[in-house]
Structure formats: C-alpha cells, structure tokens
Design a protein with these regions (language model features):
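P-loop NTPase Walker
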Residues: 1-109, 113, 208, 262, ...
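Conserved helicase NTPase motor core
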Residues: 4-15, 19-23, 34, 53, ...
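Conserved phosphate/pyrophosphate-binding and hydrolysis machinery centered on Walker-type P-loop NTPases
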Residues: 7, 55, 87, 112-116, ...
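Residue-level signature of catalytic and energy-coupling elements of molecular machines
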Residues: 10, 28, 58, 89, ...
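Short glycine-/polar-rich loops that comprise or flank the Walker A/P-loop
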Residues: 19, 47-51, 81-83, 239-242, ...
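Conserved nucleotide-binding/hydrolysis micro-motifs of P-loop NTPases
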Residues: 29, 59-62, 91-94, 249-253, ...
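Helicase P-loop NTPase motor core
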Residues: 29-35, 272-275, 280-357
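Coupling/switch/interface segments within P-loop NTPase motor domains and analogous charged loops
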Residues: 116-181, 185
Length: 357
C-alpha cells in the first residue's frame, strides 16, 4: 500500500533506507509525498516513528509534512506503536535541543526568543549606547549584515577588521547587541542555530542522545541550507549516516541570505557512498511550461543535470512582453486582465505573479 501511486524514481527513494541518500526533486515532482512515504516505509520495517527526524525550513512546510505523515502512518502502520516522527523547522529543533540540554557555553535552558521587532529594538539600543543615531544608522541593515556573517560562522572581531566602514560598525554593534541579549537571557533566530551546532559538536551527551533517539534523518530544501544548517545535518547524521537530503540546485534562490548551493552539489563528495535519485516527472505544469523551463535552466552550469518531463497536456503557448518600464508592464498586465474578464473569465481565475523586492 505504501508504494501505491508512486513512480519508479519515487519508489527507489522510498525503498532506499540505509546510508546517505540524495533526492534531487524537480519542481512539482512530488518530493513531500516521497519523503512521507519513505517515513511510512521505514516504520513498516519495524522502526519506531519516534526514531525518525525530518527538518524543513518553514512552519507551514513542517505542519503539512507532519499531517501527511501521521495520516499515512494511521493507514499503513501494522504495529501497536502510535509514536510519531519528529518533524520541525531548523529553528524549532534548535529550541528543543537548547531547552533540553542548555547551550554548550553554559547559558540557562530557560530563555526568551527575540522576534524581528525585538532584535531591531535591541540594535537601536546598542547604537544609542555607543552614542550613534539609529536614524542615520539603519538597524535593519546592520542586523542583516550581522545575521549573514553569523551564519557564515564569522565573528564580530572579523567584521571589525574589514576595510568597509559599514562592516566595521556592524562588528561593534554586534558586540553591544550580544551583551544586550545576554542581559535579557534572550536568543535571536540565528542564536538558535549557532548554539545548536555548538552543542552538537562539543557536547558528547547531547550528540549521543540525538544519535540514539533519531536513527533516520531527513533534511528538506537542502539547496537552501547555510553553513550552520549544513553542519547541523552532518552532526545529526553521525557515524550511521542515515541522512536523506531532498532538494534541487535549480531552485536555489537564497544565496543572498547565506544559503550555499555547494552543500547539495557536493553531497556526493561528503558521502561517496550516497545513492542519488532524480525525481524528474512534474505533476503540476503543462508540457509547454516544462519545455521552456528546461531550456532556461540548462544554461546554468552549476547544477545537477536532469530533464523534467510531464504527462500532462501540451498547454497554451507562452507569450513574452518586454515593457519600456514598470508602468508599461503594469499597464500591459491590466489590459490583458480586462480583456479576459470582458470575454467571460472570472477575476478569481487570473493570477499575477511579481517580485516583492
């Protein structure tokens, strides 16, 4: 029953349970379905669901995967074991570990978590304590620099030695900001990851507990992991190396916030014994869209080669309009929408996609 409805590539990914596994999943190729069915298959072999860990990036993705996994386990489980897999975001996993073990640097297990508003306010306070005006020194811009450098495992001292004056300032603010967090027994989102990897790499008890508790590790959207998340995944895999990562180098869009595409491109260097499965069948788009996507993305030389295909219909041709400026683009889109509505198309059947930045 677990393999019903899966294509051959998905079945291979589901049935490959031991050792490192790289699932290269093209857009719309059913990656979540594959991971969920893989979890169910592992449980069907006699492994407790509580020994399975899956980590993704957003609360929405974690919630969807958890709900689908629980539903499938209810249908397929042939044991009295009613435990569930641990499915969370990287940050939620960090909170869990730090509250259980405390940070390696000795900070308490009870701490508050700063949201974006809190961190901005604290950086404003740091600037003011240094005699600087937050109005002329953008706290959000400074926080962005600090966050990117922290996730690259740099230090305030390294920033302060930079030739760029903005980076030198960010290094000084970072030190004051850190003192402010410590005085409040607070951690920001970056700390949840940084202190987690510190814990996993330096605390033998915590690392051994994770290895004993979670025998099978799944990491979603691996192409978007940064250096810290990469090391968390490696530490969790341990000597057993039952690490399944899912991702697609063609969908890497977060390098600006520290994501390192090398993590997925060099997975086979990290784990030479890894099995690689390509999920190339798209269940979402028409043949026209898939063909265009393949032609565009194949120009990228830094990728895992694959060729998406679909068994859906051909679909309408793609049209391209080159506007003179943003206003001309907007005018063109509005006119096309009006034409379609006048011809009987419902407004709710029209979608307009645009970049937020």
């Amino acid at each position: 029953m677990i393999l019903i409805g899966l294509n051959d590539a998905q079945k291979k990914a589901v049935l490959t349970t031991e050792g490192p596994l790289l699932i290269v999943a093209g857009a719309g190729a059913g990656k979540t379905k594959t991971v969920v069915h893989r979890i169910a298959h592992i449980v069907s072999t006699g492994v407790s669901a509580s020994q399975i860990l899956a980590v993704t990036f957003t609360n929405k993705a974690a919630k969807e995967m958890r709900e689908r996994a629980i539903a499938l386990l209810k249908e397929t489980a042939n044991t009295s074991d009613r435990s569930i897999p641990f499915i969370s975001t990287f940050h939620s996993l960090g909170v869990f570990l730090l509250r259980r073990f405390g940070a390696y640097n000795g900070s308490v297990k009870r701490f508050t978590i700063l949201d974006d508003g809190d961190t901005t306010a604290l950086i404003k306070e740091a600037l003011q304590s240094m005699g600087l005006d937050p109005k002329t020194n953008d706290p959000r811009a400074l926080k962005s620099i600090i966050s990117k450098c922290a996730n690259a495992l740099q230090t305030p001292e390294q920033l302060m030695s930079e030739s760029n004056p903005t980076y030198r300032l960010a290094g000084r603010v970072w030190l004051a900001y850190t003192k402010g967090k410590e005085s409040q027994h607070a951690l920001d989102f970056d700390d949840l990851l940084l202190q987690s990897i510190d814990l996993l790499e330096k605390n033998d008890e915590a690392r051994a507990w994770c290895h004993d508790t979670w025998r099978y590790i799944h990491i979603d959207e691996y192409q978007d992991t940064n250096e810290v998340q990469y090391r968390i995944a490696k530490a969790l895999a341990g000597k057993r190396k039952n690490l399944c990562v899912v991702g697609d180098s063609d969908q890497s869009i977060y390098s600006w916030r520290g994501a390192n595409i090398k993590n997925i491109l060099e997975f086979e260097q990290d784990y030479p014994e890894a099995v690689v499965v390509l999920l190339e069948e798209n269940y979402r788009s028409t043949k026209t869209v898939i063909s265009a996507a393949n032609e565009v993305i194949k120009q990228n030389i830094h990728r895992t080669p694959k060729n998406l295909f679909t068994n859906k219909h051909e679909g309408d041709p793609i049209s391209l309009y080159g506007g003179y400026d943003e206003a001309d683009e907007a005018r063109f889109i509005v006119e096309r929408c009006v034409e379609r509505i006048d011809s009987g198309v419902r407004p709710e059947d029209i979608a307009v996609l645009f970049r937020a930045n």
